[in-house]
Amino acid sequence: MEPLRLADAESLLSETSVIPLTPPAQTPEAYYTESDDETAADFLVRMGRQQTAIRRRRRQTRAAGFVAAFVLVALISGGLGALMCWLAYR
C-alpha cells in the first residue's frame, strides 16, 4: 500500500481551475447590519417570513410535481388499456 502524500500547489491548481475572486452573492434581503434602522427582532421576523415563503413555494412545487406525475401515469395507463382493447378486439 502506497503511503499518503500531501497535495502540492501544482496538483491543486491547473490551467482549467476556476477560483472565484469574490464570495457568492447573497440575496439582498438576507443581510443585517447594526447601522440599519432595523432591529435584530425585525430582522428575525423578516427572515422567518422569507423562510416560510420558501417552504411554501417548495411545498407547492412538490404538490404540482405529484399531480403532474399522477396525470402522466393515468394517461400512460389509459393509453396502454386502449391499446390492449384495440389489439384484443380487432
Curated annotation (Swiss-Prot):
It is found in: Virion membrane; Host Golgi apparatus membrane; Host smooth endoplasmic reticulum membrane; Host cell membrane. Residues 1-63 are intravirion. One of its GO terms (biological process) is intracellular transport of virus. Keywords: Host cell membrane, Host endoplasmic reticulum, Host Golgi apparatus, Host membrane, Membrane, Signal-anchor, Transmembrane, Transmembrane helix, Viral envelope protein, Virion. The chain crosses the membrane at residues 64-84. Residues 29-38 are annotated as: Acidic. Residues 85-90 are virion surface. Pfam families: Herpes_US9. Phosphorylated on serines within the acidic cluster. Phosphorylation determines whether endocytosed viral US9 traffics to the trans-Golgi network or recycles to the cell membrane. One of its GO terms (cellular component) is virion membrane. It is a single-pass type II membrane protein. Its main location: virion. A motif (Di-leucine internalization motif) lies at residues 12-13. Belongs to the alphaherpesvirinae envelope protein US9 family. Essential for the anterograde spread of the infection throughout the host nervous system. Together with the gE/gI heterodimer, US9 is involved in the sorting and transport of viral structural components toward axon tips. This is Envelope protein US9 homolog.
